[in-house]
Swiss-Prot record:
Pfam families listed in its UniProt record: RsfS (PF02410)
Protein name (database record): Ribosomal silencing factor RsfS
Gene: rsfS
Gene source species: Haemophilus influenzae (strain ATCC 51907 / DSM 11121 / KW20 / Rd)
Record's subcellular location: Cytoplasm
Record keywords, A-Z: Cytoplasm, Repressor, Translation regulation
Amino acid sequence: MALVEFLMETLDGLKGTDIVHFDVRGKSSITDNMIICTGTSSRQVSAMADNLITECKKAGFETFGEEGKNTADWIVVDLGQAIVHIMQRDAREMYQLEKLWA
């Protein structure tokens, strides 16, 4: 299974909402794909990130790091070819990443 499809399905299974994918080839020098999803609370955002990393490792996808665990308003998981943003609704509305990458 391709990485992006795997990530989208896994996030959906983890009860992420408003999951969107952007192909950012030519727009970003750090990755080819951005995925953004929403969690309902800091606990859910943190758990989604932890479980996503676990599932990626089980499936053989390498993770290169994560940022934002301290507050869990917005956690970024770096998988090289894709970067996943797991955000609480307030953070997602404030930063409006969709407008940046659309």
